């Protein structure tokens, strides 16, 4: 405390004083009153960062922070829109942009610490109308609503029932339900919900882009742009200085059912609903829904959801077929893994952003592996493949969705069999022939099942009767390769999709009985037996051929006999056919190499895989290698079919 004219007044905490002083010095620098050197700006930025949790604590600090930002926006221009920061800038300073980084910290601090339920009420007069002008870049510009008296009423699914079967990634996190409403930057929206949702873990999310980008080396938008307000009363006031779509977060095991939510002082955004309880008609879409001004559009069914920029879709004509196609793909995935077609939340949730959320493609809720340029002019009818449907180009999406399903695998298959879902989508969902579906599932439509088998049979490991290499090295013969999951597609070719569906369904049933299998190292012999049980045939020779050998073949054979699982003539015939495909001279090998490397084979690549491996073997492969491969395959045939072709 300090004494002032005989009165006792409460002094600002030291942290507030330092924070205020730092922001004041930055403002004076912007106005040219007291110029700072780069290092001095960095010093003030460090003080702000250290005290950032106090930036939303008082009316004075919030007002000062917005005043500082407004000063910068008037003088230089908003972040990501001014000349220096358009398109983003490096997170680590290499000289220059010191002030921009400091103001980035201020903006992020306001979002993180000023926009809380208590502060919206306590500092409403300050926050009402307070907006970041960078919002015109991301998430997008939109005019303020016509007035708080305009109320939109929407239906949402306020239930998220318990999941059935083995755990799936993000199944127990809150489900996100679009409302078709958008909060304009600077506005305060009031959301009214039924009493059944109060104090039950529900929330209101403003801004769909929920991934935290703080680890990204390049800053292209604020790291955290989405704010969640817990629903603790029938009416909740929400705000976000960037604006954002309004969503209801439904907690796991919530059971409020279909409810109606009222939203006041928001603008509408395009929302195509293919949900069972609320379907947007094509006429509604064309005449009104796609024309709403909110900068992000939502598409949602009971099985699939995505957000894309409104600039992509305001002339898009047929979301009905699009969503039917996405639902078809979701059904193919659910059937493959023996899961119900309608789950506790959508099977897949996709979101476009200005940057990948990770340093590569990742699964997630949402899966955010799709970039756009917010400053690029669009025609309202984007040719992005997300709007062409999953049959267009979905191999990456379904690879990541495979990871998200946490299903059981043989050892070493983690980065191989996750491509299988897209084979099912294309073949079972859209009637693409199996070979083409297999090839496209890992972006190489020229790799058929037979070519994948040859890619395995020409290796030294096959000739020597060894399993496929699953080491963590470039010599690995399974990960990111068609031959690594060819065994599953082979089962489909011979027996149809049902054995795989029944197998993974049995894994779910076992889980419900308390029996769990290691998802990335399912015991080999147990897995072969259970897969054989689902196929109604002894799959040992087929799986052995594809590089996974039984650990105790004698014991496994007894188990097969005990269950009446007999050798299959289909497998026998297939192995004999593969014997005829083995290249028997250098010319045959060269033709195979050309097929699986259609762009040519360049020298200088790693000699242990891919082009590099073929570059090494092109001059070396000869008849002796072909004969050794034939002998190795004959050993497999003799081991499992000692009496020749089975009857049947």
Where are each of the predicted segments found?
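Beta/coil-rich, acidic/histidine-enriched accessory regions frequently appended to metallopeptidases
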Residues: 12-30, 35, 131-137, 520-648
């Amino acid at each position: 405390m300090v004494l002032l004219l005989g009165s006792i007044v409460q002094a600002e905490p030291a942290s507030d004083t330092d924070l205020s002083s730092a922001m004041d010095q930055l403002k004076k620098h912007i106005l040219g009153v007291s110029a700072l050197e780069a290092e001095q700006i960095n010093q003030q930025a460090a003080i702000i960062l250290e005290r950032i949790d106090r930036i939303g604590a008082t009316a004075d600090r919030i007002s000062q922070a917005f005043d500082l930002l407004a000063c910068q926006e008037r003088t230089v221009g908003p972040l990501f829109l001014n000349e220096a920061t358009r398109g983003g800038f490096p997170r680590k300073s290499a000289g220059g942009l010191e002030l921009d980084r400091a103001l980035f910290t201020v903006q992020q601090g306001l979002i993180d610490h000023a926009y809380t339920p208590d502060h919206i009420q306590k500092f409403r007069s300050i926050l009402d109308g307070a907006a970041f002008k960078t919002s015109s870049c991301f998430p997008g510009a939109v005019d303020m609503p016509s007035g708080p008296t305009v109320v939109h009423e929407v239906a949402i699914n306020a239930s998220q029932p318990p999941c059935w079967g083995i755990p799936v990634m993000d199944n127990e996190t809150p489900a996100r339900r679009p409302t078709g409403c958008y909060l304009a930057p600077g506005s305060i929206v009031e959301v009214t919900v039924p009493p059944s949702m109060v104090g039950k873990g529900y929330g209101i999310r403003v801004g769909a882009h929920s991934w935290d980008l703080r680890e990204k080396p390049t800053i292209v938008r604020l790291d955290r742009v989405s704010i969640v307000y817990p629903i603790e009363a029938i009416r909740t006031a929400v705000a976000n200085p960037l604006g954002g779509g309004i969503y209801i977060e439904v907690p796991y095991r919530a059971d409020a059912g279909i409810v109606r939510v009222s939203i006041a002082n928001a603008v509408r955004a395009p929302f195509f609903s293919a949900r069972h309880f609320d379907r947007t008609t094509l006429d509604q879409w064309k005449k009104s829904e796609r024309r709403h001004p909110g900068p992000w559009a939502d598409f949602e069914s009971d099985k699939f959801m995505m957000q894309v920029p409104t600039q992509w879709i305001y002339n898009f004509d047929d979301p009905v077929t699009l969503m039917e196609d996405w639902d078809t793909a979701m059904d193919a995935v659910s059937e493959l893994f023996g899961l119900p077609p309608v789950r506790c939340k959508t099977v897949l949730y996709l979101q476009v952003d200005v940057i990948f959320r990770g340093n590569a493609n990742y699964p997630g809720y949402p899966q955010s592996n799709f970039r756009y340029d917010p400053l690029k002019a669009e025609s309202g009818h984007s040719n992005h493949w997300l709007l062409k449907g999953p049959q267009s180009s979905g191999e990456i999406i379904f690879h990541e969705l495979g990871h998200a399903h946490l299903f059981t695998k043989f050892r070493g298959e983690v980065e191989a069999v996750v491509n299988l879902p897209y084979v099912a989508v294309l073949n079972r969902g859209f009637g693409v022939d199996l070979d083409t579906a297999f090839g496209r599932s890992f972006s190489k439509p020229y790799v058929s099942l037979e070519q994948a088998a040859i890619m395995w049979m020409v290796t030294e490991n096959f000739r020597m009767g060894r399993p496929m290499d699953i080491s963590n090295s470039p010599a690995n013969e399974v990960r990111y390769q068609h031959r690594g999951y060819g065994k599953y597609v082979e089962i489909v070719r011979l027996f149809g999709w049902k054995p795989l569906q029944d197998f993974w369904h049995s894994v779910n049933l076992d889980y419900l009985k308390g029996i769990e299998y290691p998802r990335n190292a399912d015991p080999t012999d147990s897995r072969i037996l259970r897969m054989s049980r689902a196929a109604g045939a002894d799959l040992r020779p087929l799986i052995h051929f594809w590089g996974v050998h039984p650990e105790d073949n004698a014991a496994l054979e007894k188990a097969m006999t005990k269950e009446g699982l007999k050798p299959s003539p289909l497998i026998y015939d297939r192995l004999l056919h593969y014997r005829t495909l083995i290249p028997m001279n250098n010319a045959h090998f060269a033709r195979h190499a050309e097929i699986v490397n259609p762009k040519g084979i360049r020298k200088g690549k790693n000699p242990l895989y891919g082009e590099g491996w073929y570059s090494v073997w092109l001059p070396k492969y000869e008849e002796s290698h072909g004969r050794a491969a034939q002998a190795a395959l004959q050993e497999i045939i003799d081991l499992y079919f000692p009496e020749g072709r089975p009857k049947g």
